Curated annotation (Swiss-Prot):
Family named by the database record: Belongs to the orthopoxvirus VLTF-2/OPG126 family.
Keywords, alphabetical: Activator, Transcription, Transcription regulation
Described purpose of this protein according to its UniProt entry: Acts with RNA polymerase to initiate transcription from late gene promoters.
MF-aspect GO terms: zinc ion binding
Subunit record text: Interacts with itself. Interacts with the late transcription factors VLTF-1/OPG093.
Gene source species: Variola virus (isolate Human/India/Ind3/1967)
A UniProt-annotated Pfam family: zf-FCS
Protein name, entry field: Viral late gene transcription factor 2
Domain of life: Viruses
Regions annotated as coiled coil: none
Cross-referenced InterPro entries: Poxvirus_VLTF2, Znf_MYM
Lineage per the UniProt record: Viruses, Varidnaviria, Bamfordvirae, Nucleocytoviricota, Pokkesviricetes
């Protein structure tokens, strides 16, 4: 059996097994000497708060944002469809808290943008909607399939 030892003068406030040191932000880009940096800049994010970042509709009520991995928020959206569609596009650049459930192409792809916007407005308050779109190259048609289990 192991002998129990009491150490009254020792205080363990953060044991190594539990304590994880806070990491600084990762270095963005380290180039070998034989590469030459052609562009290196930092730009603030868009500050427009009265228009949806995906469909450009006026925000007449409380906007929805994309939640980031570290608990922050980015963007202003009129619906979950718009939020998830943009999140699908930027997920390789922005660390997201959760995987987007809906993925639509940007509105510039569609000939009848109003039809897509009407669908967004119709499903704005619905929960549990998921789906995506598929581009048919031969016929130049985009099939949108949004579903719900509820």
């Amino acid at each position: 059996m192991a002998k129990r030892v009491s150490l009254p003068d020792v205080v363990i406030s953060a044991p190594k097994a539990v304590f994880k040191p806070a990491k600084e932000e990762a270095l963005a880009c380290i180039l070998p000497k034989y590469y030459k940096s052609m562009a290196d800049m930092s730009i603030k994010t868009n500050s427009v708060i009265d228009k949806c970042w995906f469909c450009n509709q006026d925000l007449v009520f409380r906007p929805i944002s994309i939640e980031t991995f570290k608990g922050g928020e980015v963007g202003y959206f009129c619906s979950k469809i718009c939020r998830d569609s943009l999140a699908s596009m930027v997920k390789s650049h922005v660390a997201l808290r959760e995987e987007p459930k809906i993925s639509l192409l940007p509105l510039v792809f569609y000939e009848d943008k109003e039809k897509v916007i009407n669908t967004i407005n119709l499903l704005r308050d619905k929960d549990g909607v998921y789906g995506s779109c598929y581009f048919k190259e031969n016929s130049q048609i985009i099939d949108i399939s949004l579903r719900s289990l509820l």
